[in-house]
Amino acid sequence: MVPERGADPRKIIHVDMDAFYASVEQRDNPELRGKPLAVGGAAARGVVAAASYEARAFGVRSAMPSVTAKRKCPELIFVPPRFDVYRAVSAQIRDVFAEHTDLIEPLSLDEAYLDVTQNRLNISSATTIAEMIRAKILEVTGLTASAGISYNKFLAKMASDQNKPNGQFVITPRHGPAFVETLPVNKFHGVGPATAAKMEALGIETGADLKERSLSFLQQHFGKSGLWYYQIARAIDERAVDPDRPRKSIGAEDTFAADIVDLETSLAELKPLVAKVWGYCEGKGIRGRTVTLKIKFADFQQITRSRTVAVPIELSDFEHLAADLLGSVFPVRKGIRLLGVTLSSLGDVLPPDQRQLRFEL
C-alpha cells in the first residue's frame, strides 16, 4: 500500500520506557533489582501505579487493587511513588529526543512520538535514529527503552510493543497492511476490552476481519469511532506528531463483565479509575478543577454527574468528589454496565499553600 495521499512516507518513532516507574526504583535501590516490585500503596484500598517485569510475570498490572496484586504475588514489594524523580528522569529523556527533532509529542512521562522525517543530524534511517536514542537514554539514565518505527503513529505504537523490553521493531509501508491484518483486534491500540468483545461478537477477531467490514457497517455499530476503525484496518493514520497538542481532560473508564447494582462494589471499581487518572496528572505535573462521573446502565442509558471547585484539587479531594458523585445516583434501579471518571479544567500545579478545596457557589 502506498502511504497516505501518495506522499513520501513519514518516519515516525514511538519510544516507550520499559516499566518506567518500577525501573527507576530498581535503578536507585539495588536491593529491589530482580524482585517483583509494585509502585503504589500497599494498604487495603491501595492501587498499583506500575509493576516491574518480575511482578508482571505473576499477572500484576497497573491500576490493579493492591490486595489483588498481593494475592497474585505474595512476595510483591510495594514502594511509594516518587513523581518528582520520575519527572526529572523524563526531562532527561526529553533532552535526548530534542537532539534529533523538535517534533516530539509526549503521551506521558514514559512515552512519546517523534517525527524524524527531517531531523537535526540528517540521518536517513529512522531505525538508526531509534537505536541512537535508546543507547543515549541508557547512557544518561541507566534505563532501557523500547521503540517502534513506522510511517504513521498507529503502526509505530503497535511496533513498540513487539520487542519489549529493550528492543525495537520496524513496520515498513510494504508490510503495514499485512501486519494489521494478522493482528487480533484486542491488541489494537485504542481498542479496549469492551470494544474488542463487541467486535468479536460481530465476528471481528483480527485486522483482516475488520477490513472486510464496510464503513457504513462500522459506523452503524461503533458510531464516530467507525471511521477510525475503518482506517486503521487499512493501516491508515494521517495524524501528525503534534508537540503542542492541548489536553482538555483526562479520563478513564471500564466496562464490566457483569452488571453492578450495589454502591460498595461500584466504589471499589471507581478507585482504580481515579488512580489511573491521577497517575497521569502526577506525571504531567497538572491538576484539574472539574470532576465528571459517567455511568452507562445495562439498557445503555447513560448519565453524567459533575462537580467543579474553585482551585485545582489534590488526590484526596478527587477521591472524595468522585465517590460523592457516585453515591448521589444510588440506589439504582438497573445494573451499571460502565463506569468512568474524568478530570477537566486542567492547569499547572499550584503552590502547596494554595491547595485548599473551595467549592464554587
UniProtKB/Swiss-Prot annotation:
Residue sites binding Mg(2+) per the record: 16, 110
The UniProt record lists the keyword Nucleotidyltransferase: yes
Pfam family, one: IMS_HHH
The keyword Transferase is annotated on this UniProt entry: yes
InterPro entries, per the entry: DNA/RNA_pol_sf, DNA_pol_Y-fam_lit_finger_sf, DNA_pol_Y-fam_little_finger, DNA_polymerase-Y, DNApol_IV, PolY_HhH_motif, Rev_trsase/Diguanyl_cyclase, UmuC
EC number assigned by the record: 2.7.7.7
Residues spanning the membrane: none
Name the UniProt record assigns to this protein: DNA polymerase IV 3
Gene this protein is translated from: dinB3
